[in-house]
């Protein structure tokens, strides 16, 4: 059953709102995926903060017109699932990780920072660590000297206690 005009306008408005805040859109073809697998993909997307939806391509074309993602319109053919995220790598990572384990989901294209990406570009974007992962690594690097210094002070204090007890 098709959507009536009001429903179509609502979908375009919803997608436009998501695209307005987005940094990345990743697109994949999803022919023949089992419902359970698609439900698992949606759950993973929700955890990662990715807006994931199967949409009519014409409605998405309207939603991305006059946005930095407008160049993606030529790639929107066939049955597609759209991942839209504010995190630069989250949408690409969710779809790419799922595609590795399910050959019925095929990455097709994406867009990041106004540039249209092909399948290889989306895979490259997905391989970049997320912001949270990079911050965790930075924090670990910054804490290493402090924890090493604290460990040295504790060892020195223990050594002095042992010398004081022996004397």
Curated annotation (Swiss-Prot):
Subunit structure, briefly?
Part of the ribosomal stalk of the 50S ribosomal subunit. The N-terminus interacts with L11 and the large rRNA to form the base of the stalk. The C-terminus forms an elongated spine to which L12 dimers bind in a sequential fashion forming a multimeric L10(L12)X complex.
As for family, the record states: Belongs to the universal ribosomal protein uL10 family.
Q: Which SUPFAM superfamilies does the entry mention?
A: Ribosomal protein L10-like
What role does it play? Forms part of the ribosomal stalk, playing a central role in the interaction of the ribosome with GTP-bound translation factors.
A Gene Ontology term for the protein's cellular component: ribosome
Q: Which GO terms describe its biological process?
A: translation
**Record bears the keyword Phosphoprotein:** no
Q: Does the keyword ATP-binding apply?
A: no
Q: Could you tell me one molecular function GO term of this UniProt entry?
A: large ribosomal subunit rRNA binding
- What is the protein's name according to its record? Large ribosomal subunit protein uL10
Q: Look up and give the organism this protein is from.
A: Azoarcus sp. (strain BH72)
